């Protein structure tokens, strides 16, 4: 078992990385003082893991209610929230109950938002089942849903009471979904740690890492994120914004393609390359740094090009949460392991966008 304690000003909670059910129940006894659990999942995870997980809880004598929403970004909306509120009320979920997010990043976001707002807030636990959720979205308390105009526009910061990461869940993922999680892992290397970059560069094989290394990269990724969240829980100082490297472009790309073409990590991979092109244009980084970023993303076998309209992408990026008064803030990198945040003028962004999307060819 590996354990990380996230120590915030208002609370602290454990990230438990273990395949042991006993380790989970030991942590659960400390985190949730209730007999009633409301397990929220999606239609894909329902088929794979819901029965196992509910039986696991019921064997310990817990009262378990469940709710299932649509899988993927199409289920990450206010309609799903409304469904969960009604379902919880019908099931007798009260303020002392505990919600459990069983699934990937979308489920973590929706279930967290539900927990933050149902009866003005109930406890919740993250049980991520994807590599992306295990290494990024389950930690840190960001919860949100999408609206028509953009991704993650409606949301709150609401910390979980426990994160249980069981890497055995990864055995049911496709290669594409493993790679989807690798993008966020690579992000930590680009923004925080050159040694981790070297490790990934040496370890990546055929677009993935050996399963024996999963727990190590999960632990490393969660450690990076936990330390940042402790220092800047709600993105007040700007330190936590570094975790959004590649995301300004990625969220615009996902919105432009109506969440149908790219998984989140795939969009982030393209977004990271765009951010480094922007860094190069502004002379924030050297050509060698750009090449290092490109090489690792290629080793992970990501598609790194897109043909979306440059002006549409610019318009969508101006709606990003980091933008102020229409000025787009980007996370850029000076070198591997060194990130900076800065506002970039529209004409510069548009010029790089046109080159990046092939409009200038």
Swiss-Prot record:
Q: What is its subcellular localisation?
A: Cytoplasm
Quickly give the catalysed reaction: 7-phospho-2-dehydro-3-deoxy-D-arabino-heptonate = 3-dehydroquinate + phosphate
**Gene Ontology MF terms in the entry:** 3-dehydroquinate synthase activity; metal ion binding; nucleotide binding
Gene3D superfamilies linked? 3.40.50.1970, Dehydroquinate synthase-like - alpha domain
Where Zn(2+) binds, per the record, is at 184, 247, 264
Question: What's a BP term from Gene Ontology annotated to this protein?
Answer: aromatic amino acid family biosynthetic process
A GO cellular component term found in this entry reads:
cytoplasm
Task: Give its E.C. classification number.
Answer: 4.2.3.4
Would I find Metal-binding among this entry's keywords? yes
**Superkingdom of origin:** Bacteria
What keywords are assigned to this protein?
Answer: Amino-acid biosynthesis, Aromatic amino acid biosynthesis, Cobalt, Cytoplasm, Lyase, Metal-binding, NAD, Nucleotide-binding, Zinc
Keyword Repeat (UniProt): no
Q: List the disulfide bonds.
A: none
Which residues bind NAD(+) per the record?
105-109, 129-130, 142, 151, 169-172
Which cofactors does it use?
Answer: Co(2+); Zn(2+); NAD(+)
The note on the cofactor says: Binds 1 divalent metal cation per subunit. Can use either Co(2+) or Zn(2+).
Q: Return the similarity comment.
A: Belongs to the sugar phosphate cyclases superfamily. Dehydroquinate synthase family.
**What this chain does, per the record?**
Catalyzes the conversion of 3-deoxy-D-arabino-heptulosonate 7-phosphate (DAHP) to dehydroquinate (DHQ).
According to UniProt, the name of this protein is: 3-dehydroquinate synthase
In which organism is this protein found? Endomicrobium trichonymphae
């Amino acid at each position: 078992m590996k354990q990380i304690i996230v120590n915030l000003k208002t609370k602290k909670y454990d990230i438990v990385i273990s395949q042991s059910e006993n380790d989970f129940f030991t942590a659960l006894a400390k985190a949730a003082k209730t007999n009633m659990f409301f397990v929220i999942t999606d239609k894909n995870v329902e088929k794979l893991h819901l029965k196992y997980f509910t039986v696991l809880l019921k064997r310990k004598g817990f009262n378990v209610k469940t709710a299932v929403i649509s899988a993927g970004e199409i289920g990450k909306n206010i309609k799903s929230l409304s469904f969960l509120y009604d379902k919880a009320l019908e099931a007798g979920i009260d303020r002392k109950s505990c919600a459990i997010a069983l699934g990937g990043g979308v489920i973590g976001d929706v279930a967290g938002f539900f927990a933050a707002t149902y009866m003005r807030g109930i406890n919740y636990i993250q049980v991520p089942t994807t590599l992306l959720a295990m290494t990024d979205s389950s930690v840190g308390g960001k919860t949100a849903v999408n609206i028509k105009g953009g991704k993650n526009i409606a949301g709150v910061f609401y910390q979980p009471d426990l994160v249980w990461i069981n890497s055995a869940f990864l055995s049911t993922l496709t290669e594409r979904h493993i790679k989807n999680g690798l993008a966020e892992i690579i992000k930590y290397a680009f923004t925080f740690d050159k040694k981790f970059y070297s490790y990934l560069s040496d370890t990546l094989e055929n677009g993935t890492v050996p399963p024996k290394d999963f727990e190590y990269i999960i632990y490393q990724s969660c450690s990076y994120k936990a330390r940042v969240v402790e220092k800047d829980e709600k993105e007040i100082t700007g330190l936590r914004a570094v975790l959004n490297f590649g995301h300004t472009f990625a969220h615009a790309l996902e919105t432009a393609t109506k969440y149908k073409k790219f998984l989140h990590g795939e969009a982030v991979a393209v977004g990271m390359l765009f951010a480094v092109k922007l860094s190069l244009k502004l002379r924030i980084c050297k050509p060698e740094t750009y090449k290092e970023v490109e090489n690792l993303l290629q080793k992970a076998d990501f598609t790194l090009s897109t043909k979306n309209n440059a002006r549409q992408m610019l318009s969508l990026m101006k709606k990003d949460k980091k933008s102020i008064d229409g000025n787009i803030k980007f996370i850029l990198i000076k070198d591997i392991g060194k990130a900076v945040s800065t506002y970039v003028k529209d004409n510069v962004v548009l010029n790089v966008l046109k080159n990046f999307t092939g409009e200038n060819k």
